[in-house]
Curated annotation (Swiss-Prot):
This is Threonine--tRNA ligase. It comes from Solidesulfovibrio magneticus (strain ATCC 700980 / DSM 13731 / RS-1). The lineage of its organism: Bacteria, Pseudomonadati, Thermodesulfobacteriota, Desulfovibrionia, Desulfovibrionales. Belongs to the class-II aminoacyl-tRNA synthetase family. It catalyses: tRNA(Thr) + L-threonine + ATP = L-threonyl-tRNA(Thr) + AMP + diphosphate + H(+). CDD domains: TGS_ThrRS (cd01667), ThrRS_anticodon (cd00860), ThrRS_core (cd00771).
């Protein structure tokens, strides 16, 4: 039989190991760096027998995204073997590769400790040094159940009973460990060259709070020790930038068990930051032709039933009873916007209608996934819904994409765009999907925006563009979304009268720019390590006196800068200047303005930046102009205007 390898046609025999076939077509160095292969696009072990109907083979390199996922999956198996060796009574459950690492969940009588993790990692290194082969066998399900029953692995039995269809299962073995697994895996344990266990946490079996609590051990693995070292450095840097730590340090927000999980309490400085962002959003939306609207926090259950949320989303909603009627606390803002559109007769001349709301929403997130500002139960969403004619769709999408570019750039982020297309289960005609997808593509291409295609990952009601921010540690964060929707206009019977007098259905776009304001602020704090841009800093400048002799002059300078719209405060404590400077730097204040005898005599202030740079003595007018210009600079790129200095 003939197979194609990198545009070469090669003679091969059915049943021959795929790795053996590849060895005749690629260099030994590349083969040595391979961890698996693709058979007609499907990932397989290098030892996988070549099917007689195979057409194409390709290597999976260790440092490729797929290769790293396979290495991490194999590392999870190696970890499970180590845990079973050290703690024989443990039960194993599942151990997948995840983004940037892997985990395995174990049922054990007590939590694992940091000392346990060290011992487990040392045991893993023994297996890796032994270079044990991974082997795959296919056995009758009944035989596999007998094997795991004899080992007391009740979770594996449940998986086979509830999740595996068919009479045959695949088992992977290495060393003394056998696991139920689809694979693929690296050829030998020695190819897991760089591995590190990171942490342990509780996790409910199948994510169900009513099921047993398991012990989840997280780890990561890379193709090289250098890559692992870089990643571990990023983890340490991320700890320093943790928004929860910085939020407390900068006195921005807090969480309290007395209030409840996932509910943030905003302190004065944090609320000021929010207010500045929200005021900016309102003004920018008005400037770009949106109408500001507001809907109620709770709506009758019948509306959620009509929209489909009750059937598809109610587990994430909160409900309450009022006057013997059921109400849902809104998890999103769209329903009120539908009713605003429907409140009057619409002509084609009235379109587009753009409704914007900074709406507070509530979603019942599981307690195990709550994480500071990044995952909360109450948050504010910068929601907008655009209803337009089909011929206006591309222009509207282009406008939203440009809006996203301007706002993301203002906050200093780079970003990536991803197009999610029609899934297998969807509503709407082929014509609707083709038109909407083309409009999304044309909008991005018209402004030269690169994008990746995520086939089949659109919502059942329409395709979408997802914008993922790249932060200072090269992490990706989902924030902005532009979503076509064929469902709600139909369910709410939204129409307009066309030029020919016919009733037509408008096209609808859901979109958010920042997404959840809380989540965005959490990302921004970590991106900037708390050193927010000057325009957004709750305190933009602090005047520091050297002795009481400068206090009267400093108070005059304070009043002058406040008149100029600067958010400034005075530190007139009887402390050493160095202490005051360090404290201001810890608080991430952009400008430290020192008032000593020399500055008092000259009628100015010595300007120091939080970076440590000293700009020398400036007059009060120069200081005011400098800080104002610093605030205005980021806005110029998007043709926007800064006017939030005097909050």
């Amino acid at each position: 039989m003939q197979v194609t390898i990198e545009d070469q046609s090669l003679e091969a025999a059915a049943g021959e190991a795929c790795g053996q076939v590849l060895s005749r077509a690629v260099s030994g160095k590349r083969l040595k760096n391979a961890v698996a292969c693709l058979v007609d696009g499907q990932p397989r072990d290098l030892a996988f027998p070549l099917p007689e109907d195979a057409h194409e083979l390709a290597l999976v390199a260790a440092d490729s995204p797929m290769g790293l996922s396979i290495i991490r999956h194999s590392a999870a198996h190696i970890m499970a073997e180590a845990v079973k060796t050290l703690f024989p009574s443990v039960q194993v459950t599942i151990g997948p590769a995840i983004e940037n690492g892997f985990y395995y969940d174990f049922a054990y009588e007590r939590p694992f400790t940091p000392d346990d993790l060290e011992a487990i990692e040392a045991e893993m290194q023994k297996s890796i040094a032994a270079n044990q082969p991974f082997s795959c066998t296919y056995v009758p399900k009944a035989d596999a159940k007998a094997l795991f029953a004899a080992q007391g692995e009740s979770y594996k039995l449940e998986i086979m009973d509830e999740n595996i269809v068919g009479d045959t299962v695949s088992l992977y073995r290495h060393g003394t460990f056998t696991d139920l697994c689809r694979g693929p895996h690296v050829p030998t344990t020695g190819l897991v060259r760089a591995v590190k266990l990171l942490s342990v946490a509780g996790a409910y079996w199948r994510g169900d709070e009513k099921r047993p609590m398991l012990q989840r051990i997280y780890g990561t693995a890379f193709a090289s020790a250098a890559d692992l070292k870089t990643y571990l450095h990023h983890i340490e840097e991320a700890k320093k930038r943790d928004h929860r730590k910085l939020g407390a340090q900068l006195d921005l927000f807090s969480f309290s068990e007395e209030v409840g999980a996932g509910m943030c309490i905003w302190h004065p400085k944090g609320e000021l930051i929010r207010t500045i962002i929200e005021d900016f959003e309102r003004r920018e939306h008005l400037r770009r032709g949106y109408d500001l609207v507001r809907g109620p926090l709770i709506l009758r259950r019948e509306l959620w039933e009509r929209s489909g949320h009750y059937d598809n989303y109610r587990e994430n909603m909160y409900f309450t009873e009022i006057d013997e009627q059921s109400y849902g606390i809104k998890p999103m803002n769209c329903l009120s916007h539908m009713l605003i559109y429907k409140s009057r007769v619409r002509s084609y001349r009235d379109l587009p209608q753009r409704y914007f709301e900074l709406g507070v929403v509530h979603r019942h997130e599981k307690s195990g996934v709550l994480h500071g500002l990044l995952r909360v139960r109450q948050f504010t969403q910068d929601d907008a819904h655009i209803l337009c004619r089909p011929d206006q769709l591309q222009e509207e999408i282009t406008g939203v994409v440009r809006f996203v570019q301007d706002v993301v750039g203002l906050f200093g982020f780079d970003f990536e765009a991803e197009l999610s297309t029609r899934p297998e289960k969807s509503i709407g005609s082929d014509e609707d999907w083709d038109r909407a997808t083309k409009a999304l593509v044309d909008a991005m291409e018209s402004i030269g925006l690169p994008y990746e295609v995520n086939e089949g990952d659109g919502a059942f009601y329409g395709p979408k563009i997802d914008i993922k921010l790249k932060d200072a540690l090269d992490r990706r964060w989902q924030c902005a979304t532009i979503q076509c929707d064929f469902t709600l206009p139909e369910r709410f019977d939204l129409v307009y009268t066309d030029a020919d007098g016919e009733r037509k259905r408008p096209v609808m776009l859901h979109r958010v720019i920042l997404g959840a304001v809380e989540r965005f602020l959490g990302v921004l704090i970590e991106h900037t390590a708390g050193a927010l841009p000057t325009w957004l800093s709750p305190v933009q400048a602090r005047i520091l006196i050297v002795t009481d002799a400068q206090k009267e002059f400093a108070e005059q300078a304070l009043a002058r800068l406040k008149e100029a719209g600067i958010r400034v405060e005075l530190d007139d404590r009887n402390e050493k200047l160095g202490f005051k400077v360090r404290e201001a730097q810890v608080e991430k204040i952009p400008y430290m303005l020192v008032a000593g005898d020399k500055e008092k005599e000259l009628g100015g202030l010595n300007v120091r930046l939080r970076s440590g740079e000293n700009l020398g003595v400036k007059t009060l007018d120069e200081v005011a102009l400098m800080i104002t210009a610093d605030c205005q600079e980021p806005f110029k790129r998007g043709g926007m205007r800064y006017n939030f200095c005097s909050q």
